[in-house]
Amino acid sequence: MDFGISTMPLEDYQLKSKLTLLKELGIKYLEVKPKEGHFNYYDPKYLDEMSKEFKGNGIKIVSMHMPTNGVDISLIEEYDRIWSVREVEKTALALLRLEGEILVVHPGSEIKDEKTRSVQREKSEQSLEEILKFCEQWGIKIALENTLPGKTGDSISEILEIVKKFNSKNLGICLDTGHCNITSSINNHSGVVKCLPEIKNFLCHLHVHDNSGKSDDHYLPFEGNIDWKGFVEGLKEINYQGVFMFELRKKTNNEEILRTVKESYYNLIA
């Protein structure tokens, strides 16, 4: 099992300017966060240039996150929903250009009124069907991520239900450890260790970060209360074959946090 990082801690910088640092630190696998001023996913020439830069620095793009600039595939207003679907599809094409494999998708954002939960779930599935059809023709796999409480897909059981409904080899689950820890703490749902056997046949990607079960802190492992020993043992038991992808909150000292990531990973798997 290899480790990688989401570029989230670097999102305030042009990603190109940090590739030398990543190479020096031996970080070979990335999940790209598409954000203007950080990584311009909508510019084909830029993507081709970055593809060369990644290869030149020995870096492989494993995954890309869907945009978070207002994109929400569960929106009820059809104009906004379709716009969101198209933005996600643009990131799929960007990922394809970088020879990446996994597109991380949130099933939806905040549910303002519980009465609309079922409607938003329906819209989310409608959008997901369209995105999945688009991605299947390019061989890109969608990893549906469990979200924070109060959002569409805020439980492992709901994520699992959606994935099983589509029954597609191009749709799997991205387990976000931090989100799962909060949901299990607040709503008494399955925690990060307990849920692994439930999702083992669909788990294709990870977002690894820690918290104390109250807020989405995106800490390094062992800075919160997640049972990391049990989690790593659980991954081995289900024979997880994906990348151990850290998703940490941005820090002021990027080099320090990136060095710590590597140390943290080797401490976890030792």
How would you label these PLM feature ranges?
Residues 1-100, 172, 190, 201, ...:
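N-terminal pre-domain/capping segments
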Residues 1-4, 12-26, 84, 155-270:
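Histidine-acidic metal/acid-base catalytic patches
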Residues 14-17, 56, 73-173:
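Active-site acidic/histidine proton-transfer and metal-coordination neighborhood
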Residues 31, 63, 104, 143, ...:
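Conserved beta-strand positions in the central sheet of alpha/beta enzyme cores
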